[in-house]
């Protein structure tokens, strides 16, 4: 069965998945607030961030959300974590959620500490859980656009919703694996961005592959510990939503979070680094939320804490590195 899909958010990530869904035979209407972007997409049939990619005819665009929702059998969002609440609030004013809503963004809301899926449930109410889905995993947008092989996970509370979303996204090169631990999938995608900033700092100081692999491994330990205390399955974090996404983000040349960390090591301030990148660096905001939650629950997360202190307490990076290296070497899995 082919879907009629409203895709909310036409940044590079949103466009890459909208393009994938259209190439998979679905009718897709992409929505964005920016009328100039919508006009360019509609007239030139090229995305400014990917001008080499031709847009299929069954992918259209609008800056009016009600037009995107007309006849939709599925809604997919691809906005920033900060944009999640206002976009879903606008969506709630236009429709009650009676079709699958697939979250593809990764982050934790500032101030509230809510996962993006929890924001959706707060806005639409607990009964909406039956329609909620979450897609995550190692998936660099530019590679998805090129049709490179990619493996991700999709999670949902309702088995029928899970099957419908799985069927919509699955292609010969975009492998979609079901996972029933939605909260674990969401946390893995959010927390890995903080570890990626630490890996970028390591890159900036040219500490080498040994140091970076150590950060990834100990970072995964932090993520898994945090998620387990939050009620998630540890195995979820050992898979694509945890280890897989963490590896891609920390080692990819296209990772904003890793680049951000590298720029910090080169002497830029956080604000200067964000300006130079010119796009949202989710790990900056997740570091604050994760630190607040970890402090409340007394979860020891030394790498995450160090990144937080560098960003929000003006901790000298060299001092932060020294503090990490001076920690006791406990039994590895404790």
UniProtKB/Swiss-Prot annotation:
Pathway terms, separated by semicolons: Membrane lipid metabolism; glycerophospholipid metabolism
Similarity remark: Belongs to the NAD-dependent glycerol-3-phosphate dehydrogenase family.
Name of the protein in question: Glycerol-3-phosphate dehydrogenase [NAD(P)+]
Alphabetized HAMAP family for the sequence: NAD_Glyc3P_dehydrog
Primary location recorded for the protein, binned into one broad class: cytoplasm
Gene Ontology MF term list: glycerol-3-phosphate dehydrogenase [NAD(P)+] activity; NAD binding
Binding site for NADPH: 13, 33, 106, 141, 256, 280, 282
Enzyme class: oxidoreductase
GO BP field: carbohydrate metabolic process; glycerol-3-phosphate biosynthetic process; glycerol-3-phosphate catabolic process; glycerophospholipid metabolic process; phospholipid biosynthetic process
Subcellular location: Cytoplasm
Gene: gpsA
């Amino acid at each position: 069965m082919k879907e009629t899909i409203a895709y909310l958010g036409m940044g590079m990530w949103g466009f890459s998945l909208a393009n994938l869904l259209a190439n998979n035979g679905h009718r897709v209407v992409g929505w964005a607030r920016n009328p100039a972007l919508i006009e360019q997409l509609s007239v030139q049939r090229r995305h400014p961030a990917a001008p080499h990619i031709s847009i299929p005819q069954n992918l259209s665009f609008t800056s009016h959300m009600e037009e995107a929702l007309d006849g939709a059998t599925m809604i997919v969002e691809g906005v920033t974590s900060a944009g999640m609440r206002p976009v879903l609030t606008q969506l709630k004013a236009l429709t009650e959620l009676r079709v699958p809503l697939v979250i593809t963004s990764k982050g934790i809301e500032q101030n509230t500490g809510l996962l993006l899926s929890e924001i959706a449930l707060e806005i639409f109410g607990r009964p909406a859980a039956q329609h909620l889905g979450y897609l995550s995993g190692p998936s660099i947008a530019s590679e998805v656009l090129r049709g490179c092989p990619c493996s991700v996970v999709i999670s949902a509370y309702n088995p029928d919703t899970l099957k419908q979303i799985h069927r919509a996204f699955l292609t010969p090169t975009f492998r979609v694996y079901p996972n029933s631990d939605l909260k674990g999938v969401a946390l893995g995608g959010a927390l890995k961005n903080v570890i990626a900033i630490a890996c970028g700092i390591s890159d900036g100081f040219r500490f080498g592959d040994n140091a970076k692999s150590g950060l990834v491994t100990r970072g995964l330990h932090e993520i898994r510990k945090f998620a387990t205390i939050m009620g998630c399955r540890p195995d979820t974090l050992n898979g694509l939503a945890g280890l897989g996404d963490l590896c891609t983000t920390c080692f990819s040349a296209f990772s904003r979070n890793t680049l951000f960390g590298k720029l910090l090591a080169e002497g830029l301030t956080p604000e200067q680094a964000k300006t130079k990148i010119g796009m949202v660096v989710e790990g900056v905001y997740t570091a604050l939320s994760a630190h607040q939650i970890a402090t409340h629950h007394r979860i020891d997360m030394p790498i995450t804490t160090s990144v937080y202190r560098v960003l929000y307490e003006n901790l000298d990076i060299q001092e932060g590195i020294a503090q990490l290296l001076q920690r006791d070497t406990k039994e590895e899995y404790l």
